[in-house]
Amino acid sequence: MTKVESTSGEVSEWADLNKDILELIFNKLDVMDITMGASRVCISWFLASHNKTLWNTVDLTNLQELDVSRIFNFKDKERPIFFYKHPVDHKHGLTNLLTKIISRFFLDFFEVEGSISLMNLLVEISKLSRMAPKNLFFNFNSYIQENGLKFAAEKMPNIEKLALPIWCYQNEKSLRFAFSQWKNLKTLIIAHEHSFSGRFDFKAVGESCSNLTNLKYLGRLEEYTSREIVSYLHSLKRLSLRCFLVSSIAVYRFITGLPNLTILNVSHCKNPYDYFLPIAKSIDNYVITAATQKLEKFITCPHDCMICKDRCRYSLSYLAEVWRNDEIKELEF
């Protein structure tokens, strides 16, 4: 292949690529590559980047974080704003970009540089995806500011599967607006830590998302949280509490209080009152009996589970690596 230079003549060669080849290239790229790179090569690539099939899923889970840009205060606590690497604003311009795209396509290598905030990235994505996305997955450590969540909900109202990160500080008004837009939501994955972000408004979810049947909750499950889930999410059929802290009382509450629940996953969970004790070893017999009588599947881990024995696996860094995994297939992403 000849060396690519940033001249109009050679750009036209890229513009004239066969549509099938262009489709292969775009399918090889991720959201960041398309939004901040390929869509800016030439007009034909820009038009191709609007293809709805590219935007069924907006997957931001693999964004590579740069150093925190600055610290801001939120409710007397300091919180980070993350920026992400992307393949533009490089001194070599188009030549460098095309080289990276071809390297990614043929060699599975794509180095990215520069930075962009999450809010600005959502703006750029919405210009190309329009209202096509049905799945929206944030990076585990992303911080979604209030206007960012509102913007995502307004521009992507057809979301059916959503993964919200642990740094998601929202007031009641912003959550209510967001979920009022996501009326088609079927699956919700929440990485939530009460000490970081306060209470999550499950009432706002329940009032707007009548089609929600799948929920995954990662975090220390407070008793009030389990009561709210039972009170407001009556349509749940599948619930996963994988890899965190939950009590026998809460498990029993879910089994008996959620009328449509068929599958409950408590694998790798620990007792919140004894971090050394896996829930599988501490769960009471009355809970087992209730699960056996009602549920189609009650997922626990074996008593000799190596994950449960490793306390380091319950750190946030570990959860950031595994939160996409689940024994319930509907909750994988």
Swiss-Prot record:
Residue ranges annotated for the F-box domain, each copy included: 11-58
InterPro entries per record: F-box-like_dom_sf (IPR036047), LRR_dom_sf (IPR032675)
Protein name from the UniProt record: Putative F-box protein At4g11580
Source organism of this protein record: Arabidopsis thaliana (Mouse-ear cress)
